[in-house]
Structures are given as C-alpha cells and as structure tokens.
Amino acid sequence: MTIRSGERQQQTCTPSRVLLTGGRAPITLDLARMLHRFGHRVYIAESMEQHLCRGSGVVEQCALVPSPRHQTTAYLSALEACVKRWQIDLLIPMCEEIFYVAQGAEQLRKHCRVLVSSPEQLHALHHKYDFIQLAKSMGLSVPDTYLIQNSQEQLEIQHVLIKSGEWVWKPVYSRFAAKVRMPIHQAPPGEELISRGSPWVAQRYIHGRGLCTYSVVHEGQLVAHATYESKFRTGDVGASVFFEQVEHDGAYQWVKQFVQQVAFSGQIGFDFIEESDGRVYAIECNPRATSGIHLFHPGDGLVRALFEPESLLNEKKEITPQSGDKAMLALPMLGSGIRQANSRANLRSWMTAWHRARDVVYTRQDKHPFFAQIAVVLAAWRIARAQRITLTEALTHDIEWNGEQQ
C-alpha cells in the first residue's frame, strides 16, 4: 500500500528533540519545518556562520561547530556536546558531513539514535566507480565506466574511448555536477588533474531524460520514495532547482533491488538517465538526503518514515508524494529562467513551471530564511574569491568528503 499526499498521516510518535546538521541546505530547512509541524523540537549544528536555518522560527537553537572536513575530531566533539546539552533523541545528518558523522557514530549512539550507515558502506556508494561496479555485479543497468588514476591509465584507455562514442568525465569524489566535463563541448581533464588521490571516471554518455530519486530505507526495505525529473538546473549539468514528482516503475524497481541487496538503512538518492525506450541507467548514488524531500508535504508521512520505519513496514505502507507535485528553489530558478530566454518554447516551459511550483524556502509563517539566502550567498562568494574556487564549491568546501581517512 502506498500512502499518497491526499491521505494525511496521523503522527503517532512522541514529540522528540531532533538535531539536524547542514543548516545551510534548503532540504534541512524543509525537514525542520515538517518536524516542527508535528511537535518535535528542532536544533541545528552548522559550520557556516550564515545559513538558512539561522533565525528560522521552527528552530529552537543553532550551534556554530568546527568544519567537519578540516577539524573532524573537534567537529565530532562539538556534535556530541550538542547532543548532550540539548538532550537529543535523534540525530539526522543532512549533507556531506554525514561521512564524518559516520566516523563518530559509535560514540554518538551512546546518547541518541543516529540515522547514518557505516563509513565503509557510505564510501562504497559515494565513490563514482565503486558504486557502478557494485550495481553492475547485481545485474542492474549502469553505463560503461572506467576508473582513471594517472596519466598512463588515461593514455591506455584513450583508444577504447575514441572508438566507443561519447564520454562524460567527472572526479570520483564530486557533488552537484562540479567539474563534470561533457562530451563535445569540453575536452577530457588534463593529466595534471588526475592522480591516485584525485581519480576520475570516464562514463559512457547516454542520451535521454534525467531522473532523480530520494528514498528512506530501513534494513533494506523502502519506507518512503520519490522519483522526480530534473528539468531546470543551475547550469547545463548543475544542481537541480525545479523538482516534479513522476511515477516511474523502472527507477523504483532499480532502487528497491539495490537497497535490498546492500541492506541499506537511512536516506539515499540516485541519479538516472532514461533512454527513449524507458530503460533507466543509474549514473550516481548520493547516500544522504537529497532534494526529493521538497516533494513531501507535512502530512505525507515522511516524518513518520524517519521516526517509525518499523511500524510502516509492519503495516506494509510506503510513503510517496502525490504524482505531479512540484517544488523549486525560487532564486536560482530565476537564474535558470534567464538562460531560457533565447528560446520562446523553453521560456514558456519555464514560466509554466514557475507558476505551478512552490518555493521551498519562502513561507508566510517563516519568512526569515528567504532573506537569509542573500547572506549565505555573500558569505560563500567571499570564500570563493579568497580561495579561488567556484561559488558552488564554496558552499560545500568545509563539509565535503573526498575519500579522506580511507
């Protein structure tokens, strides 16, 4: 049985104290609002001083903590202190700091429940080559993918790539399509960018529609799931800024088989390409929360899936958004609209999407985060300028995980 958004769920779990990490992310703000709606007390731990959840009316308190990436030990100590001080019942890592939280999960679980898988499993799923090999071993559809760790390996594989169509190049550790090199428009990375410590993959380019999924999984069983189409992005291949729920049995069955075979627990997302015949190929895995959260409304039952997955499994219920539900990040969506202006058809499509989707950041009852976006972007811009990195990279530079301590 699937619970649609029209069938509002009764919240049965006792109000709890929940600590979310990644207060800079819209998904964290959206989940915080859902939790607050059902009486839970929400706390935030964030390493950026300026973030979306700061000042939100649904958040009890925020803590500024050290960088997970650059000060891991201090970060975990600060997180444990937050858990004890606020008497947290459930800790949910929301962004890439999940890899660091996983390293300290054993200690943190002495004080509260922590929604995180093992560091080893997270690494296997995050690694863009290891994930493909794992899925391939299960007989699941994935594109041909080659691991390149040095200039010699790049040279050896060139003859295969030249004869075999178009290829996408991307770092093994990357996010939001950062540094991705698409065929035709961009050349392969130079040998100075590739090393054993910074490997890349060459992945066969598949023409088709981009689809993404978000799921909550308990011991290999789906308890919540959304599939959504990526129509508008920050760039040609950047992060999605518009999300529309679609029904897609192929993607659903792919995810269901994969999470069952790896016995996953937690939040997880996948990126797919759907060919014209409807077949889907998984190209990446994100073993953490993703933007699919935005498609769930407070009454849909996502909070219950996070708190009481066992009860949903016992009742044989699975939470999904209503087909056709739409959401967007309004400010970057405006930027995407400017890019559509050179085509009347594209602009018309964008305008239709704009008018039919809700902004996930702005609500009348909690306006502060909408205006906080300006401060967040300005802070990231200063970091980008100082470190000579892109704005997207600046937004994750202190929390991203690139295989360290493996």
Predicted regions and their residues:
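ATP-binding N-terminal substructure of ATP-dependent carboxylate-amine bond-forming enzymes
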Residues: 1-116
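Glycine-rich phosphate-binding loop signature in dinucleotide/nucleotide-binding domains
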Residues: 82-88, 161-163, 196
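Glycine-/Pro-rich loop/turn segments that contact NAD(P) or position catalytic residues
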Residues: 121-145, 150, 155-162
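ATP-grasp fold ATP-binding core
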Residues: 135, 143-145, 159-179, 197-208, ...
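Glycine-rich phosphate/pyrophosphate-binding beta-alpha loops
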Residues: 177, 232-235, 240, 286-299
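Phosphate-binding site of ATP-dependent enzymes
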Residues: 184-253, 273-281
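Conserved metal-phosphate-binding beta-hairpin within the catalytic cores
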Residues: 260-295
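Peripheral (often C-terminal) accessory segments that flank ATP-dependent C-N-forming ligase machineries
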Residues: 304-406
